[in-house]
């Protein structure tokens, strides 16, 4: 099953992968046609950027710019896990996650899901979006599809969303509190702030 999923990603196709609490559509982050297909499957509005998954902390340095010691500390402490970092992307990156390259930033994490981590270590960065229509609830069962390969590990346990930290220069701001609390993050990065409502 893993080999078929890997082959599909390398061919520029969309697959279904499990995360901690839901299934997602996934594809090679550098394949524009695959990223476009991913957004079509979800009926995403124009300009929506996919999130990125990587298989290890070390990959981040090649994708993001302006990595500070605090960002690296957060990544090492909470990855694999439920921390999403929203970072300025490396200027040399040749990808379009669905925003036409206008955002100049991307959201990334290393998931704590062993089967998916095995895939990521062989594929490099993948673009993902929830395996459902935009705005719908996350899915805990892998959607049945004859058109795409699926790494189906059965029903997943529903759970909280990841916590999202936005990075702007030296400033770290929690823009969504999810599985990780603000207090947990502040123990690692004391200067982190909580976005005002």
Question: Which residues does each PLM region occupy?
Answer:
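Active-site-adjacent structural elements in enzyme catalytic cores
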Residues: 1-197
